[in-house]
Amino acid sequence: MPRVKGGTVTRKRRKKIVKLAKGYYGSKHLLFKVANQAVMKSYQYAYRDRRQKKRDFRRLWIARINAAARMQDLSYSKLMHGLKLAGIDINRKMLADLAVNDIASFNTLADSAKKALAK
């Protein structure tokens, strides 16, 4: 069986990995073996954090809504329940945006929630 030399193919593959590791600290951006491990790990972090980002933003929106709701003497859960009873279907992202940028509109929604809870 003849000897197989992977010259250009192997070099190209390794060069691609080292290029992906550009900017990494120490030997991680120089040595193929270490760079390969670092790149693989970075892919794992990226995959995990794309999912975690959705959770993080939801937590941020809830914290902002809760802070604005408490200025109206409502807890987050009471506000959300009141909005549901009032038939106001607004998502947390929009509600958090109103709480930060347009407090008057948020207060109107909070008043609607209070009235619905009082019934």
UniProtKB/Swiss-Prot annotation:
UniProt keyword list: Ribonucleoprotein, Ribosomal protein, RNA-binding, rRNA-binding
Annotated coiled-coil segments of the chain: none
CDD domains: Ribosomal_L20
GO CC terms of this entry: cytosolic large ribosomal subunit
Lineage top rank: taxon: Bacteria
Transcription is among the record's keywords: no
GO biological process: ribosomal large subunit assembly; translation
Residue intervals passing through the bilayer: none
GO molecular function: rRNA binding; structural constituent of ribosome
Family under the similarity heading: Belongs to the bacterial ribosomal protein bL20 family.
Stated role: Binds directly to 23S ribosomal RNA and is necessary for the in vitro assembly process of the 50S ribosomal subunit. It is not involved in the protein synthesizing functions of that subunit.
PANTHER family per the UniProt record, alphabetical: 39S RIBOSOMAL PROTEIN L20 (PTHR10986)
NCBIfam families: rplT_bact (TIGR01032)
Name of the featured protein: Large ribosomal subunit protein bL20
